[in-house]
């Protein structure tokens, strides 16, 4: 048999109507209530101190790493798709909303035929962008994607960067992309120091040749 313990032995349950009214007044009229009213009136009477904006006429500027609707990136130099069809984004998706269909081309390399995301089911956790080895899928800043239907699918042509807009594609854009200082966080290998020594010797030889002339 379970043992039950009283949390507050001094607390008495109100019986009469007056006891119930007095208990309600004691709980509602406290110092914290007046503190909240004071803060509200102080912010209300301040000039040019609006805590809201007139949406959709005004919009808040979002950070580049904000997780909104996905984007599929291209290589700027070759205009090819970055996606290699490894399927890691589909496997790691905890909402099970990513579907990918791949096939082999004439060179025996895998290519993505169909790619779809159920945006109505996606929770925008960013796992797909974090796990992508080629930085092919990132999160953009397009957040106005409300729809009337529950299942709202986006397809490959919706996410992929158009070739005519490729010049506007920024490398470090969207959640999942590398940071601008990513190279500073990579551990140096022995080959790195060998290359730096060779460059230093080349610069030294160039300076000596310039002085001899």
From Swiss-Prot:
Residues reported in the UniProt entry to bind [4Fe-4S] cluster 1: 83, 86, 89, 132
Pfam families (UniProt xref): Fer4_7
Keyword annotations: 4Fe-4S, Cell inner membrane, Cell membrane, Iron, Iron-sulfur, Membrane, Metal-binding, NAD, Quinone, Repeat, Translocase, Ubiquinone
Family: Belongs to the complex I 23 kDa subunit family.
Organism: Campylobacter jejuni subsp. jejuni serotype O:2 (strain ATCC 700819 / NCTC 11168)
EC primary class: translocase
Subunit relationships: NDH-1 is composed of 14 different subunits. Subunits NuoA, H, J, K, L, M, N constitute the membrane sector of the complex.
Cofactor, how bound (note): Binds 2 [4Fe-4S] clusters per subunit.
Binding-site residues, [4Fe-4S] cluster 2: 93, 122, 125, 128
Cofactor(s) essential for the protein: [4Fe-4S] cluster
One Gene Ontology biological process: aerobic respiration
Protein name: NADH-quinone oxidoreductase subunit I
Membrane topology per record: Peripheral membrane protein
PROSITE patterns documented for this protein: 4FE4S_FER_1, 4FE4S_FER_2
Residue ranges annotated for the 4Fe-4S ferredoxin-type domain, each copy included: 74-103, 113-142
SUPFAM superfamilies xref list: 4Fe-4S ferredoxins
GO molecular function terms noted in the UniProt entry: 4 iron, 4 sulfur cluster binding; iron ion binding; NADH:ubiquinone reductase (non-electrogenic) activity; quinone binding
Domain of life: Bacteria
InterPro entries: 4Fe4S_Fe-S-bd (IPR017896), 4Fe4S_Fe_S_CS (IPR017900), NADH_quinone_OxRdtase_chainI (IPR010226)
Catalytic activity line of the entry: a quinone + NADH + 5 H(+)(in) = a quinol + NAD(+) + 4 H(+)(out)
GO cellular component: plasma membrane
Compartment annotation: Cell inner membrane
Main function: NDH-1 shuttles electrons from NADH, via FMN and iron-sulfur (Fe-S) centers, to quinones in the respiratory chain. The immediate electron acceptor for the enzyme in this species is believed to be ubiquinone. Couples the redox reaction to proton translocation (for every two electrons transferred, four hydrogen ions are translocated across the cytoplasmic membrane), and thus conserves the redox energy in a proton gradient.
